[in-house]
Swiss-Prot record:
Protein name (record): tRNA dimethylallyltransferase
EC category: transferase
Pfam families hit by this protein: IPPT
Reactions that this protein is recorded to catalyse: adenosine(37) in tRNA + dimethylallyl diphosphate = N(6)-dimethylallyladenosine(37) in tRNA + diphosphate
Gene Ontology BP annotations: tRNA modification
Keywords: ATP-binding, Magnesium, Nucleotide-binding, Transferase, tRNA processing
Amino acid sequence: MPQPMSPPAIFLMGPTASGKTDLAVELVRRLPCEIISVDSALVYRGMDIGTAKPGPEILAEAPHRLIDILDPAEAYSAARFREDALAAMAEIAAAGRVPLLVGGTMLYFRALEFGLDRLPEADPEVRAQIEAEAAASGWEAIHARLAAVDPPSAARIHPNDPQRLQRALEVYLLTGRPLSAFHGGADASTLPYRLLRLALIPADRAALRERIARRFDQMLELGLIHEVETLYRREDLNPSLPAIRAVGYRQAWAYLAGEMDFETMRSKAIIATGQLAKRQLTWLRSYPGIEVLEMEQLDPAAVVARVRAHLEAARAGAGP
């Protein structure tokens, strides 16, 4: 729980392609902030183009913590992110700077602020039962079953994501509690920081979809297929790994495997990215205490002023 003289921290949240990085860099230029990435794909090395990872020039000006920390063969979790982010926040605050947490992995934000209950270990029998049902009825039927018992998890997990669907339903079958109840079930912050929660949200969904399509085409021009081909050649990687299941990567992988042609791959990747943005916005709408920044009318100078006021209030020990 934050105390009157708790150090300040900033959350900058938003869907994919909403302009979070540009705004974060502007804040770093103007204020004593240091960026911590809140993104489940940016943690992976060798996955730069398809994740829209900031380039060397941006990173030189505004270093990001928690990017390029894992090999794509490794898995990352909300629990590990929370541990890593708390350590980074403490280091930044101890240096007299302000943690600026930027990203679109909303589960990570919730885990960081509200904590995580201990999840049950995997159960081979339950997993086999779910896999048998999926083999008989399809993963869409598993998704529908999950939606009946855990609507929030079903809203954020795509029907074509068997790994996460299986885990979410497994947790419910083992505990009688939905997975979403473990992910920060309370809305009382556990962080010892005075938080300002900013959310970039589009007023026009169609405009965001257009930005997503343009950005994916830019990724293709920059060499996304070659980047994924480098991963595809590795014998230790496969499409069931979390890194390869990232939006854009799984479609490019399927294209390289001969499962679809180029235009189908492009179309599916753009649609999947739009679906990701929709899920991110669903999470944002239910996130407590956010201040909405309208994406199309964004005034960076006004955001800098708002953050500066938050930092001054924190130093003075004034109210939130």
